[in-house]
């Protein structure tokens, strides 16, 4: 491998979220800023919004007259 072509790896990179949560990880950057993390993401907080997929299927069937036979 060639010397001097790889970026310097930082073992204690601080990750800052928009919600105020901070944690450390490894990266080639010294600091990372993210908009969403596991502390504020709806999937991890349990505050998920259920999407009504059934309504979309009914709309499709109605549009193409499927199931009315």
Curated annotation (Swiss-Prot):
What does the record give under GO molecular function? metal ion binding; rRNA binding; structural constituent of ribosome
Keyword Metal-binding part of the UniProt annotation: yes
Do you know which Pfam families this protein is assigned to?
Ribosomal_L31
Q: What does this protein do?
A: Binds the 23S rRNA.
Which gene codes for it?
rpmE
Keywords tagged on the record: Metal-binding, Ribonucleoprotein, Ribosomal protein, RNA-binding, rRNA-binding, Zinc
Q: Which Gene3D superfamilies match?
A: Ribosomal protein L31
Q: Name one GO biological process term.
A: translation
Q: Report the protein name in the record.
A: Large ribosomal subunit protein bL31
Binding residues for Zn(2+), per the UniProt record?
17, 19, 37, 40
Record text on subunit structure and interactions: Part of the 50S ribosomal subunit.
The cofactor required is: Zn(2+)
Read off the PROSITE patterns from this record.
RIBOSOMAL_L31
Paste the cofactor note: Binds 1 zinc ion per subunit.
């Amino acid at each position: 491998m060639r010397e001097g072509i790889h970026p310097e790896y930082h073992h204690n990179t601080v990750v800052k979220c928009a919600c105020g949560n901070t944690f450390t990880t490894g990266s080639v950057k010294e600091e990372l800023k993210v908009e969403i993390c596991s502390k504020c993401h709806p999937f991890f907080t349990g505050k998920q919004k259920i999407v009504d997929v059934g309504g979309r299927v009914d709309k499709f069937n109605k549009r193409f007259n499927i199931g009315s036979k």
